[in-house]
Amino acid sequence: MNAKECMIETDKLLQKWSCYSIENRRYIEKIFNGSNRYDMMLNVDVMQKQAKIYVLERGVTIYEYRTERKEIVIYAVLRDIIGIISDTFICDSHVDEKGYLHFTENVSNYRKKIADEAFSLMGEPYNEWNRQGISIWDFNRSFGGNKRPTFS
């Protein structure tokens, strides 16, 4: 497994979705090249035989998951990008007159509908994992193994 392989495969899968853009492709590169240092943003370091999926808060790693499975790495990135794109749609259509977003059941359902539509185009195993509601925070429970998540 290498970072370039993961980026190319993720990009190919996302190109199946009409909402994907060149800006999102740049974000994939940031996830893998270590320049994505904002709070609560996904980062991936691909080493020789495994990848480290992690999230930072104020420069400190607050969550880390290690895996040897390329499809888990790709799923983490797909989930992150699809979430960002769906948030854009939500902000464009579900804010009040003052510009505030209120997370109501309608907003949550709309976000889920967008994600479900996108993952249905990505195929398996990604679509199934999305149907199961697996997020990066659930990787240890869902994918098990000796790859323990770390919370700081």
Residue ranges and their predicted role:
Residues S86-S152:
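Intrinsically disordered, low-complexity, charge-dense segments enriched in Lys/Arg
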Residues G59-E64, E71:
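Short Cys/His-based metal-binding microdomains
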Residues M1-I8, E68, I72, H102-K113, ...:
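Alpha-helix boundary/N-cap detector
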Residues N33-T61:
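Short aromatic-glycine-(Arg/Gly/Cys) micro-motifs in beta-strand/loop hairpins
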Residues I28-F32, M47, I53, F103, ...:
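Extended hydrophobic/Leu-rich segments
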Residues E68-T88:
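Ampiphathic alpha-helical segments that act as solvent-exposed interaction surfaces
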Residues W17-N24, I84, P125, W129:
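Short secondary-structure junctions and interdomain/linker hinges
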Residues M1-N43:
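N-terminal "first-domain core" detector
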